[in-house]
């Protein structure tokens, strides 16, 4: 009998038992089905007995008993009465936890509208009824009447009538028509809607509509109608007759001491609903006047609104404490809501946290665990061990032993801990290396010991950081921890494949000191027969570490030092000696570790790292390097350099006073002078670092003394500090920036050793404070960026080996400003070839398609002279719901092909987000010293070769130099075989000093230009005439107050004017340019005229100058917002106008206050209106490519997509994002950015639905679109047409297929409302959905591929089964 009753109750679903989850509107029948009884009274619990009031909000009869297996009145106790319903109090005898899942309901006296569907944007109810939210609300809140059935009156259905109009109609038509107010009236209208007919009508209207605005509006409505039609939801379910009541345990009432109660806000909200509902019932029974009833109904509607969503209402209901009450919606949304607080961020049992201290004596796979902590964490295991060994017979006894901390307990703990890894985590966990597994070693004290080499990965230091420890319990968890998460298995960074376990600080300093050379050290010049002899001599103190010696290695003599031979002892055999026969800085050590890892494997690397750490610390200790004030030597030439600079500044000031230069130019020049002098002082300081007062040294001696200067060694080895910081200590601090980013033109000439004057100190504080303020703000921003990135990419895994696509992307070396910033071999490392590669000279195949490129192959490809490769990429991968292994390439963290199930989306997001946080924390290290990049105004050849010109349009000046007259002009330097070696862009107006075909040496000047102004240059000679120059309208005479000289500056002028400089020929006619157009040069606002009427000019002369903006300092502050802007695909504020076709530029007058630029292509012409005052960067007669900007400004990514297509856009986004990171010296592999870009471009917008079920303007997943089209074509129908879409990451994350994931990200209520109306099914494909549902995530070892893998328990001696609940109860 009891079994049958027990089976009536729903058992909690096992998360593995279902594969998808659907959300839809609840019908009134469904709500009644959920409910265990009606809540009729607003009372909660009896204040004297503390027992719940019957029929109240905590009623035990409805929701279940308060104590396990016990009814309320106490007639039935114990488990034997399971399932009995008490005849006295009506409570069922069952576990009290049913109070967490049993719901009640409230029968409403009048229907109410659900606020989510009324108030959401766009309002769902409004769209269905074709009413505005305003009208709808007036009806629902009983202000206006709505016509339900017009009968045979001239009224129309859904007409809105005010109180007076309604009375008028009643007197006119009597009861021929039907109108009503409130949710009842709305429900009747919703019931009348025939979805099929309305949908058909709308489709016809959309076909007939002419304007896109109307089409869009109708489509919006059609979408909602279709959603209701396809989902099986009825529109009238948006109006509620019955309100479900949450189980009482989820809205608890907790007694505090002192007889007061802490209650969940929901209880107050429910109480108001019940009170008003009961009052309304009573009023209706008493047949109260309609006004009173109407008011009560409105109040009921409002109270239900507040219960469901208190934030959507204009006036949120406040508690007594003036804070808004937390409604049901507030419970689920936001950081403190159900999703993010309880489902995605659970607390974990078997965990502890403590301060970390350094443990240099540990091996790399170990961590020190405090004894007391370990005992607590491994308690169950210790109990088991004590029983096993016979020290205790029951758990209770074992407990007692542990509490007494007897000696056998510690022995048991030692044994338990053997081979049982623990996880260490340091918050914030910015990438997956923030949690790693270690073998615990018991230590005294209360601090966790951490190996110094893993600090980089955790970003930990020992200034009070804390870390958390977690214990993996099951065999499976232990195996995963050991195989996948062990610190020795994570030597490479997933972001770029470089070693992340690189020695830092002291270790670097020690190794660097060990490998230095000192020519007068003891034993210098000695010759040894083998390394053993050297070590013996060193141990006998016959030679010093730094002595340069000769040693016979592999049969030949090598010049080296004693220290390097000592270092050779710890390096694996087989590493070429030349790799370590040099001063080993941090960078060199990184290369060495990478080499060892690549050639000798993980095991040797770890052994080497362990030895390296011990040796580094040892030597650093012996060296006795420290900082002393005399180490900061102030250069003797400093005063004279500063005097010289002051003289130059005076000269610039004089030129300004005479009116030769403008204020802006003066400022820029002064900044430049000081930036240069700071550099020179720094150079002098570096030269003289080793000097002592009153002693003379030869330059050679000085160089050696300098190389042993403590501060120099710290910076040079890469241990701590930089040359820039030494400069501030001993050179001069240099230019500082204001908080706004402008540079203050008086620099700080003092350094920290001399000390600063109060004024200098005050100027310094700007930068220092801004640095600290920025850090705080930007950490939050970077964290938010990471969160958005993870959310957009969390459902991308590796699903299959090969998607079979033939597509790929082309990759070349990245060149910026003539310099290769990223060589080809770095860019192709870890990628898969998309086609066979042939040697350009011999034609033999170097590698077949689908080969993964490792370091050796990358080198081979580059050496063969190939400079452009087609590789496979995630951007072109055809795998649905994921990516294939071939397109992704190598798993950078393990340098082998990536495995199926790898969560590459999350790895990509972490790789991009983690340095964002890092960078933002690093803005203030130079204390705001302005690091202005000295404007490059001279171009020098880097190597030797032959000069070639590439699309240069120029005129020759009298002196034989050439002046460039177009943009995208280039100078190329080729080697003897005609291969391009260097490539330089030239700016408009640059002066070329070399001739085409000339052979140049490295360092030779090629061209120069003015870095501060953009000139306007004449192409022909002649006499100057000015047009439309009206003072005060198109230009103003600016008289410089300091100089008394005047010049003409063009100002923002009315559209009818076109100020210009015209060149006249001998006859006084307007001369013609070689292209045939008239020689007129339009002057933009801000231009400063250099010529005057009647002047005679030669070809190549400057007519006017446009000053460039004054310089601001560059810093990732510009960087992080820039990265966010690119990922969010925002349209830039000052977007450049871009040419849509290839063609020749023509200037054509102006219209409506804008200049008109025409681009003439081969078969089409495009006109562009340029707003006045914008600086045009193309010139008449220039040839522009599609996608090139015509005016200054950032390019709008959406226009790249439209003009150049998706491939170009993808390349642009990847390159632009990489640029920002590269500026900060952060290396991220392209593939990570590609993964995110793939997600941003996964949707298409339907332009023409054809015969498919799509609607115009629908945003559909690319794969679904292709699939649907294939089906339609197979049926012989017309396929849909669509254009690719670029979504920002926030929008892409919200438009994911999974509603659970989207709701837990942002805008929870909107996502849930939309999903419920469509009755969306979540297939639980991504990580987040599965974490929320409490399932194993479908990535890594949880992948469907490994579903049936079992782990054999024999490897582990421990038996965990001992700890099921029953065994504890029995004892």
UniProtKB/Swiss-Prot annotation:
It catalyses: RNA(n) + a ribonucleoside 5'-triphosphate = RNA(n+1) + diphosphate. Zn(2+) 2 binds at residues 803, 877, 884, 887. Binds 1 Mg(2+) ion per subunit. Binds 2 Zn(2+) ions per subunit. It holds the Pfam family RNA_pol_Rpb1_3. Keywords: DNA-directed RNA polymerase, Magnesium, Metal-binding, Nucleotidyltransferase, Transcription, Transferase, Zinc. SMART domains: RPOLA_N. GO terms for cellular component: DNA-directed RNA polymerase complex. Zn(2+) 1 binds at residues 71, 73, 86, 89. Its EC number is 2.7.7.6. Its cofactor is Mg(2+); Zn(2+). It is an enzyme of class 2 (transferase). One of its GO terms (molecular function) is zinc ion binding. One of its GO terms (biological process) is DNA-templated transcription. Coiled coil: none annotated. Mg(2+) binds at residues 461, 463, 465. Belongs to the RNA polymerase beta' chain family. DNA-dependent RNA polymerase catalyzes the transcription of DNA into RNA using the four ribonucleoside triphosphates as substrates. HAMAP family: RNApol_bact_RpoC. The RNAP catalytic core consists of 2 alpha, 1 beta, 1 beta' and 1 omega subunit. When a sigma factor is associated with the core the holoenzyme is formed, which can initiate transcription. This is DNA-directed RNA polymerase subunit beta'. It comes from Thermodesulfovibrio yellowstonii (strain ATCC 51303 / DSM 11347 / YP87). The gene is rpoC.
